[in-house]
Amino acid sequence: MSRYFLLACTLALQCVAASQEDYIVKDLPGLSNIPAVVRPVMHAGHLEIDEEHNTELFFWRFQNPKNNGTHQTLHRNELIVWLNGGPGCSSMDGAMMETGPLRVSDKLEVELNPGSWTQVADILFVDQPAGTGFSYTDSYDTELKQAAQHFWQFLKTYYQLFPEDRTKKLYLAGESYAGQYIPYFAKEIIENNSLNISLEGLLIGNGWIDPDIQSLSYVPFSLEAGFLDRQSPSMAQVLKQHEKCQQAIDDPSNHDFEKVECVKIFHSILAASRDETKPAKEQCVNMYDYRKHDYFPACGSNWPEGLPTVTKFLNLDAVQKALNLKSAKRWHECDGKVEFFFQPEHSVKSFDLLPKLLEKMKIALFAGDKDIICNHKSIEMVIEKLQITPGQFGFTNSRKSGWIYDGQEVGEVETQSNLTYIKVFNSSHMVPYDLPEVSRGLFDIITNSIEKRSTDIVTPVYDSRGNYKFVEEKQDTDQNEEEEKEKPPKHHHSLTFYVAEVAILAVLAYLLYSFYKSFAKSRKSAFLSLSSKKKKKQVHWFDESDIGMDQEAGEADHKPKSMLESVFNKLGYGGQYDTVQDGRDIEMAPVEEHEDQFIIQSDEEEFGHR
């Protein structure tokens, strides 16, 4: 679309309306099976942002059908822009597997997503940086500032095409490497807001915000999650790599956006946790969801499970025609060329942008608790070092609440000033993929469309028409009555049984007393003993001043003082590493910014943050 055509459109509303008609998505396989009353209104296609370099970004816009009850009550006039990460991973992941209104069936037909975020707002998915997904260019972005400028140019062109959206409250949302994009894009909008856009808030899920802080979460998180065995022969190598990462961070001459030494921690953990006794496809833990497994060294690159179906669907000729592509393009989830060129060397990390942004808008950081690569512990470590208000770092006067959805506790929420942290239970790197209906509550939380209880918050349950209700507690009265009926009658034991029971309790009490005495004077050690040599570790998760660490402490051979302690030693817990509950004491030096953690070698090897 030429600049002259766009200029003409700004002068003639009829022209704008006509141009919108060209972007309507009129049909998709299976769309006719969805009732018209709940069928989303869709526009899609390319917008030119740089004619000289043949740069056009692809978008897919979803609107909820008119007269939706939710839009008239809880939510009014709101627009979400959703961005996936990478760098170089398509936001069609979000559209077709996460927050969009459609899913793809095994028949390669669309069907409704019961957890669509269009129940709470209109939503716009953008493939960026240029070259990602269906977008294309002759000149790839290399820096975050450059990507932000291109995104701002896209928004200006988009608002010319859809001027009615300029009055909507804007929220930027996304996951993973979007933890870099979103703060940069918000800053660009604020500094160049000639359109008077009302940017209300940011939502970042399992975000990659500060590579240095977050890389140091991998070892403690992996141990706490249980997929890394502290008894593993490879544990020494993992800890050695952790130490190298810490040294690289502390090195004032190392200005790398992301330190190679820190990237290697992650790879060493995947190698150390490999189980070669299992079938090949189950040997490696899934880096995006440690409940699942994959081939080694893919370790999650074959996830999510719905990706092959979505890939086939988006590469159908009929689908690409319906999406108004200017020319056919083979869709890949992640583009290797984009990742290869996007190597920020002159950008500060997005962590450094957050304090100023928090002065102007609400920011929600959410994390699925089963992710490894951008795990919840790493987000908590980022928050501890983040200036939330001038002079205040981390949560100091926050309130933690349980999050209730449809009568179930689905997470924890902590808020102070404009910052909210949400830990989502039983979910992966892609929270909306696992829990679509629950995830919609993330937007309810940032917009305060909730009900509060004494210790909990409750987010609404929506139906397909947008009607909603708040369900604080599930009523399972009938089920409880059935369970009560099925209980066997109580059995009354003889006097001999009770005498024996008292004797057993007495023995247990003696063993516990012995256990207490043997451990009363024992010291905690921040690291697993790697050898009998008395060598103090340079990398630690406790400050030495806090625990009185010296070279002699905790390194002498420990002899069991009781039968119960012997059992603990046999199980591998005697005198071993004590996990640390937070990352406050990790020594950090000022660091630079970040690119993606994993190199994509080619279009076929799609591996990295999403």
Swiss-Prot record:
The active site is at 176, 371, 429. The lineage of its organism: Eukaryota, Fungi, Dikarya, Ascomycota, Saccharomycotina. Residues 19-494 are lumenal. One of its GO terms (cellular component) is trans-Golgi network. It is found in: Golgi apparatus, trans-Golgi network membrane. This is Pheromone-processing carboxypeptidase KEX1. Its main location: Golgi. Belongs to the peptidase S10 family. InterPro entries: AB_hydrolase_fold (IPR029058), Peptidase_S10 (IPR001563), Ser_caboxypep_his_AS (IPR033124), Ser_caboxypep_ser_AS (IPR018202). Keywords: Apoptosis, Carboxypeptidase, Glycoprotein, Golgi apparatus, Hydrolase, Membrane, Protease, Signal, Transmembrane, Transmembrane helix. It is a single-pass type I membrane protein. The chain crosses the membrane at residues 495-515. It catalyses: Preferential release of a C-terminal arginine or lysine residue. Glycans are attached at residues 68, 192, 196, 418, 426. Residues 1-18 form the signal peptide. One of its GO terms (biological process) is proteolysis. The keyword Plastid does not apply. Residues 469-491 are annotated as: Disordered. The keyword Lyase does not apply. It holds the Pfam family Peptidase_S10.
